[in-house]
């Protein structure tokens, strides 16, 4: 028997009715012990982690770099972190990358990021 190309197979499928194609798929699954539904299940499972990321409610505000305006960033850090002295804030800024806030809600994290970036820092939310 001559080997058929993909194009020849597709042309043969185009000439078949839906019932004939359905019967072909069932027989193909039986002969090769595969199912046509397996890729759909894998795709659905792959979508689940993306949904989990969208539902994230707690964020860490991470100071990546203080930038050129280190004094302004130190002041911003002292405003954001209660009870932090000047020395501790300076050490925190100079030790970047460091988490400034951990487990903050989205609004607080966004506000802190904006404040630090306004002061000249490079900040990421994780």
UniProtKB/Swiss-Prot annotation:
**Gene Ontology MF terms:** mRNA binding; structural constituent of ribosome
GO BP, one example? Answer: translation
Q: Which Gene3D superfamilies match?
A: 3.30.1390.10, Single helix bin
Superkingdom of this entry's organism?
A: Bacteria
State any GO CC term. Answer: cytosolic large ribosomal subunit
Respond yes or no to whether keyword Ribosomal protein is given for this record: yes
List the InterPro entries. Answer: Ribosomal_bL12, Ribosomal_bL12_C, Ribosomal_bL12_C/ClpS-like, Ribosomal_bL12_oligo, Ribosomal_bL12_oligo_N_sf
The UniProt keyword set, sorted, is:
Ribonucleoprotein, Ribosomal protein
Instruction: Cite the PANTHER family for this sequence.
Output: 39S RIBOSOMAL PROTEIN L12, LARGE RIBOSOMAL SUBUNIT PROTEIN BL12M
Q: Which family does it belong to?
A: Belongs to the bacterial ribosomal protein bL12 family.
Q: What does this protein do?
A: Forms part of the ribosomal stalk which helps the ribosome interact with GTP-bound translation factors. Is thus essential for accurate translation.
Question: What quaternary arrangement does the UniProt entry report?
Answer: Homodimer. Part of the ribosomal stalk of the 50S ribosomal subunit. Forms a multimeric L10(L12)X complex, where L10 forms an elongated spine to which 2 to 4 L12 dimers bind in a sequential fashion. Binds GTP-bound translation factors.
**Protein name, UniProt field:** Large ribosomal subunit protein bL12
Species this protein is from:
Corynebacterium diphtheriae (strain ATCC 700971 / NCTC 13129 / Biotype gravis)
Query: Species lineage, top-down?
Result: Bacteria, Bacillati, Actinomycetota, Actinomycetes, Mycobacteriales
